[in-house]
Amino acid sequence: MKEIYADSKNISVGSFAYQRSDQVHALATNNLDFVVDPIIPRSDEINSEKVFEDDFVVMYREGHDLSKIKDVSVDDILDQKHLHVSNRRRGLHLIDTELEKIGYRREVALRCQHFLIAPTIIQSTDLVLMGTRSFANRNNLPFAETPLDIPSMEYFLIWHKNDEGDGGHIWMKDLIVRAFKHAQR
């Protein structure tokens, strides 16, 4: 936001959830300028650029039993109670889908709607969180590597092709891309 306001004090930025099925239309009608999502809509009307990729780790509090294990196994992870972060009431996470492929299931003891509360929950309970390495580092959460072959978490910046030549759109796109690169450090 600092960079945005340094160059343009009259700009307004919003961030909110949108139905995936409505994204292409919302981009085409300029109801949305950009979408950041792990799934690129199937449409010839949009362009995208990968802005984030990170591998999964298992996070826990200081002194947790997992911190005492040198090479954490799948069973070690699955023996734990998990925190699941999702804005949906039910449904699987990418991690759960990958676990099911190899015949495993984790015990989700608590679901919360946002990652903002996750560090406090992890630091004050015995729950573990499977999330990205950058999230663990940014929140100073101890973590272990996962022995699971889980695809990396990827997010894409998505925009409508009609906006390709717009100077303001190009400027904002470049700011967003730089912000994601900075966030992964």
How should these model regions be labeled?
Residues 43-82, 167-170:
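Flexible hinge/capping segments at coil-to-helix
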Residues 11, 27-36, 56, 104, ...:
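Alpha-to-beta junction loops
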Residues 1-43, 112:
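Central regulatory/effector-binding core of bacterial HTH transcription factors
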Residues 66-67, 80-102, 165-173, 183:
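Secondary-structure junction motif
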Residues 1-9, 92-105:
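Ligand-binding cleft/hinge of the Venus flytrap
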